[in-house]
């Protein structure tokens, strides 16, 4: 009984105590390319060509590519200023068709860099899967994936909508739990910028609870465990 009580405190009380709003302080002065072209849209997804302006894309490559090649971490959290910038969020909102906001600061899946290299073991991402939704039914959660550097032969498949080459500076918005997809590549390397957004303002201490239903809270716990375990696994498997 004592063990159960301690677990409940860890699960429900500790997050309230440790919450601290994240400060996105890496300023790369990025912007969305005004000439981007939306070429595919369906239930749970939007695909856009040339989503970032070229200066922004190159800054991301110059800042993160060499570091990613050296440490070969699957995920590297980055506090990019434009992730929570109102102007940038407005530009993305216009592409998706609804208002977008940063996720809660207690979410580990927020804004991060992911690096893939030829021959790496990444089996999970080669199978069909949904992105995990960490919020309640009244909140939509989107993941934006952008290959800011890509020399690979990557193919992106959305179940029921076909397969297309996933090329440099493409932007793919995926709604969590509403878009079954997979990504495959055999050759080359890729540096991805990945950002999670929601369509409701939920970044405060209480919103960690009020914006999630029971399933969403369970998925948040699951996501915390998955993020840590998968990073350790891929680090060991690909060392």
Language model features by range: what are they?
Residues 1-42, 206-239:
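Fe(II)/2-oxoglutarate
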Residues 23-105:
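Non-heme Fe(II)/2-oxoglutarate
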Residues 48, 60, 88, 92, ...:
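Hydrophobic beta-strand residues in large extracellular and virion-surface proteins
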Residues 51-52, 132, 178, 197:
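A broadly conserved detector of short glycine/acidic/proline-rich loop/turn motifs that flank catalytic sites
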């Amino acid at each position: 009984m004592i063990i159960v009580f301690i677990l409940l405190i860890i699960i429900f009380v500790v997050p309230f105590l440790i919450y601290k709003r994240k400060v996105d302080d890496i300023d790369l002065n990025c912007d969305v390319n005004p000439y981007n072209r939306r070429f595919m849209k369906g239930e749970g997804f939007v695909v856009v060509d040339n989503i970032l302006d070229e200066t922004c894309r190159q800054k991301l490559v110059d800042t993160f590519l060499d570091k990613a090649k050296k440490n070969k971490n699957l995920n590297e959290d980055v506090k990019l200023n434009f992730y929570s910038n109102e102007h940038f969020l407005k530009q993305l909102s216009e592409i998706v068709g609804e208002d977008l906001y940063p996720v809660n600061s207690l979410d580990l899946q927020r804004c991060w860099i992911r690096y893939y290299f030829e021959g790496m073991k990444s089996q999970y991402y080669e199978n069909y899967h949904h992105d995990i939704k960490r919020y309640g039914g009244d909140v939509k959660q989107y993941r934006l994936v952008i290959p800011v550097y890509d020399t690979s032969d990557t193919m992106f498949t959305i179940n029921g909508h076909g397969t297309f080459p996933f090329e440099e500076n493409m932007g793919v918005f995926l709604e969590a739990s509403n878009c079954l997809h997979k990504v495959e590549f055999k050759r080359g390397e890729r540096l991805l910028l990945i950002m999670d957004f929601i369509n409701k303002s939920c970044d405060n201490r209480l919103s960690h609870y009020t914006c999630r239903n029971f399933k969403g809270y369970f998925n948040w716990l699951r996501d915390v465990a998955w993020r840590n375990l998968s990073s350790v696994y891929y680090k060991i498997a690909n060392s």
